[in-house]
UniProtKB/Swiss-Prot annotation:
Native source organism of the sequence: Bacillus cereus (strain ATCC 14579 / DSM 31 / CCUG 7414 / JCM 2152 / NBRC 15305 / NCIMB 9373 / NCTC 2599 / NRRL B-3711)
PROSITE patterns, sorted: FERROCHELATASE
Pathway: Porphyrin-containing compound metabolism; protoheme biosynthesis
Subcellular location(s) of the protein: Cytoplasm
Protein name: Coproporphyrin III ferrochelatase 1
Catalytic activity annotation: Fe-coproporphyrin III + 2 H(+) = coproporphyrin III + Fe(2+)
Protein encoded by which gene: cpfC1
């Protein structure tokens, strides 16, 4: 009989319906309810992208496809997928409890975020391992980062090339690629967090692979807190690049995310487009990885490499 291995797929989570928005943001704010104005603003953002984010559906599809693919490409072990979310059910701890109840003793934990940071990957894996230790007889093997995975870089190289191939030579000369990820509080840099360096590296790999000469790194979706967040913000960067270099076509690659959701559909497709419209420039944004076969193949390699190194 094949050994069963847990596949703990972790992600941020998103409201399933409009009524979930308040409790979801209360959880993000560690139990403090958002003010009525804040709640209205958030609800309006969701309405602007069609009422609710497609993220919940995409995350589940990514996780199910990954489980299926892992069990197709090898015959040594049987992977059982459990979904654990940071801010809404099924919570990370619930997924770990389910694994324990199913008699799983080893699990590979994959966070659907390519770059490591203490705020994201470390906190997800930490929560899972803490719960597993409480329950006993279950070891969680966490994957730190996978931004260097060749198939991940290739996904974005192909996506970016697809946009540039549709441009004339003249447009290409005046085009710039903005590679971005979710901003985090600046204090992580002083703590030696590798997150900003990993994004810079990712941008270099993609620009080199796609043969894009003009590119810059930006940050987006910063939180509304008194602490300074990592910049430059993608909107400010857009204006600055237009003013300084006269770029008139902007290609946004939000590589810190793996799916279409509020941060991409609103912060990029709406907010950044407002800026490009303002300055009379063109807006482009390649398709996100979502549950595409190319991306599922990438994640499959990531999990298999981890399994080989620990089990």
């Amino acid at each position: 009989m094949k050994k069963k291995i847990g596949l703990l797929v972790m992600a941020y989570g998103t409201p399933y319906k409009e009524e979930d928005i308040e409790r979801y943001y209360t959880h993000i704010r560690r139990g403090r309810k958002p003010s009525p104005e804040m709640l209205e603003d958030l609800t309006e953002r969701y309405r602007a992208i069609g009422g609710i984010s497609p993220l919940a559906t995409i995350t589940l599809e990514q996780a199910k496809k990954l489980e299926k693919r892992l069990n197709e490409v090898q015959d040594e072990v049987e992977y059982h997928m459990y979904l654990g979310l940071k801010h809404i059910e099924p919570f990370i701890e619930d997924a770990v409890k389910d694994m324990h109840n199913d008699g799983i003793q080893d699990a590979i934990a994959l966070v659907l975020a390519p770059h490591y940071s203490t705020f994201s990957v470390k906190s997800y894996v930490g929560r899972a391992q803490e719960e597993a230790e409480k329950l006993g007889n279950l070891t969680i093997h966490g994957i730190d980062s996978w931004y260097k995975e060749p198939k991940f870089i290739q996904y974005w190289v192909d996506a970016v090339k697809g946009i540039y191939n549709g441009m004339s030579d003249a447009e290409r000369e005046k085009a710039v690629l903005i590679v971005s990820a979710h901003s985090l509080p600046e204090k992580i840099i002083a703590m030696g967090d590798p997150y900003p360096d990993q994004l810079n590296e990712t941008a270099d790999y993609i620009a080199r692979g796609a043969e894009v000469a003009n590119y810059a790194v930006g940050w987006q979706s910063a939180g509304n807190t008194p602490d300074p967040w990592i910049g430059p913000d993608v909107q400010d960067l857009t204006r600055e690049l237009n003013e300084k270099h006269g770029y008139t076509s902007f290609v946004y690659a939000p590589v810190g995310f793996v799916a279409e959701h509020l941060e991409v559909l609103y912060d990029n497709d709406f907010e950044c487009k407002v800026v490009t419209d303002e300055i009379g420039a063109k807006y482009y944004r390649p398709e996100m990885p979502n549950a595409s076969d190319a991306f599922i193949d990438c994640l499959t390699d990531v999990v298999l490499k981890k399994k080989e190194s620990v089990l």
